[in-house]
Amino acid sequence: MTIVKKVARLRDWIALKTGAIRSPMIAEVSGYAARFTVQSVEEIWRIRDLRGEQDVIRLLLEEAEEDDVLWDVGSNIGTHACICSTKANVFAFEPNPDTFDRLTENSDRAPGTVIPLRYGLSSSSGDISFEPSPIAANGTHKVSTEGSMTIKTISGDELVESGEVPKPNVVKVDVEGHELEVLKGMTNALQSVNFVIVEIHAGVDPKDVTKLLSEAKLSTEITKLNRDEDFVIGRRQND
């Protein structure tokens, strides 16, 4: 961490502790806003600049129709979910218990409907090892054979078949390397999807993601969205 970032971190920590930064904070994208409680410097930073996620949220807002069902897979503390709830009914998936608690608190403040679900979506149901970030808002939790935590996984298709969640129209996936397993577990659900955006992490070939989305009859593109990471976007073309 650079000296500048250390100073900024200390400044925000002091502001949080002294009440100079008040909770809730407001985050806004394209005129759509939501309020978020903040309990750490990391959450202040995440809400203040959305960690470079503005373009992702903007796309979700542009593509979602009123009252669509949006799956936010890898929701973290709920920035995307809460802002997008102004247009869509959001089902927010977050397996980390600490982060899930923060997601739930923010969902209660959301301007629209956000249903928090403490599941890790995958290709099948079961238990897997999971390595949480030491700080809830960091968003660097990941599946790992050496993980210190066990989480429950379930496939998206199984959730739909059980009636617990409706089929999605819009999907956002940000799962730190588990992207392919998430998509393999929702091959049926993808048939109803009009728009999906998948953030690509280390170890995942974006071409493998485009292949799965193409099988669901979605047209695909790989883009950067002004970020270092690749994103795969899938859209259903109107006949």
Curated annotation (Swiss-Prot):
Subcellular location, in the record's words?
Cytoplasm
Mutant lacking the gene: phenotype: Mutants exhibit defective or limited motility.
Q: What InterPro entries does the entry give?
A: FkbM_mtfrase (IPR006342), SAM-dependent_MTase (IPR052514), SAM-dependent_MTases_sf (IPR029063)
GO molecular function terms listed in the Swiss-Prot or TrEMBL record? methyltransferase activity
Q: What do the Gene Ontology cellular component annotations say?
A: cytoplasm
Q: What is its EC number?
A: 2.1.1.-
Record pathway:
Cell surface structure biogenesis; S-layer biogenesis
Instruction: Indicate where this protein is primarily found.
Output: cytoplasm
Keyword terms:
Cytoplasm, Methyltransferase, Transferase
A biological process (GO) annotation for this entry? Answer: S-layer organization
- The protein's superkingdom reads Archaea
Could you say which protein family the record assigns here? Belongs to the FkbM methyltransferase family.
State its role.
Involved in the assembly of a N-linked pentasaccharide that decorates the S-layer glycoprotein and flagellins. S-adenosyl-L-methionine-dependent methyltransferase that modifies the hexuronic acid found at position 4 of the pentasaccharide.
What PANTHER family does the database record attribute to this sequence? METHYLTRANSFERASE, FKBM FAMILY PROTEIN, SLL1173 PROTEIN
Report what the protein is called: Hexuronic acid methyltransferase AglP
